[in-house]
């Protein structure tokens, strides 16, 4: 078994190291991660310049001067002779639930695996600062082991969020849907030394839909949330109405 491991917090992140150590007994692990923290990079690819790959003398981890998606893309198309059995991303320093998944570099690294037909799992720790990281890595390894022993059909993309709790206090796993956030807080305006305005993106909004069945509800209740995602963004319920709208606008009968 071979696992390609990546993240969006960078190759020096504690979450990556903890997950690597937890997965080592399960498979051969190749690590390819971004050189820098790329939180919020989403699925961006670097197309305006060439990419360089380096290897850490301390850990043996490979890293690229690009995005999480670059990392997985380069590994799958330029380094590995055969596909890995699984792409794993994480453990992220903070949750990736609800609308977070659209911006998440952690989820994006996993998504790139799916683009090339490789099953993928993204792991995130719900709160920042790495509290109970070792326990989260233990849970992640259990989930990966279960997947390797009992694979899901097709090429699943699983988004997994782990509460910051001691292992003994976690209540188990729950399969969930994505919740929904309120819009983000407004940007924070400041002034640079030249007197010019600069802007910081505001904090994420609070949970809007945290009802039972959502990832927000599960993790707040002490459960590990497992949300299956898909790449097809088609709004199928809108197809008929959109056809009627387009037909009316084009003058077609």
From Swiss-Prot:
Cofactor(s) recorded in Swiss-Prot or TrEMBL: a divalent metal cation
GO molecular function terms noted in the UniProt entry: 3'-nucleotidase activity; 5'-nucleotidase activity; exopolyphosphatase activity; metal ion binding; nucleotide binding
Keywords per UniProt: Cytoplasm, Hydrolase, Metal-binding, Nucleotide-binding
CC per GO annotation: cytoplasm
Main location group: cytoplasm
UniProt-listed InterPro entries: SurE (IPR030048), SurE-like_Pase/nucleotidase (IPR002828), SurE-like_sf (IPR036523)
Subcellular location: Cytoplasm
Record's cofactor remark: Binds 1 divalent metal cation per subunit.
Positions annotated to bind a divalent metal cation: 8-9, 39, 92
Catalytic activity of the protein: a ribonucleoside 5'-phosphate + H2O = a ribonucleoside + phosphate
Pfam families attached to this UniProt entry: SurE
E.C. number: 3.1.3.5
PANTHER family: 5'-NUCLEOTIDASE SURE, 5'_3'-NUCLEOTIDASE SURE
Role: Nucleotidase that shows phosphatase activity on nucleoside 5'-monophosphates.
Family, similarity comment: Belongs to the SurE nucleotidase family.
Protein name, UniProt field: 5'-nucleotidase SurE
Organism: Burkholderia pseudomallei (strain K96243)
Gene (name only): surE
